[in-house]
């Protein structure tokens, strides 16, 4: 079994578990499951890691995109530059952090922006806002 999941708090707004459960089923991935790990404090991520031996990946949502970084063994360059992580890959117990928000926001912005757009107003200061700021550079 390969376990994937989402960490954050609260997770009542999230559609991730339903989406990925349906996606795994439609792709014939019976050995894959997706769980929500609603943790009130970031320190509880250690419990998630220790109690989920089949865990291979996590999505990270509010309020932990910034707070999760000290729990990573490796962070990619974008995580280092933005100070935000939204995706963790676990290989042989090593937790590697990535920021895929930058790619998503960047792709969306590239469709709309032209060379005449020289300024932007980014509302917010959290992990997603940091990804947007990075994508706008």
Spans of features found by a protein language model:
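Phosphate/diphosphate ligand-binding glycine-rich loop within oxidoreductases
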Residues: 2-113
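Conserved beta-strand elements of the Class I
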Residues: 5, 121-123
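Glycine-rich Rossmann-fold phosphate-binding loop(s) that bind the pyrophosphate
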Residues: 9, 124-126
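Intrinsically disordered, low-complexity terminal segments enriched in Ser/Thr
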Residues: 116-118
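N-terminal Rossmann-fold NAD(P) dinucleotide-binding loop
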Residues: 129-130
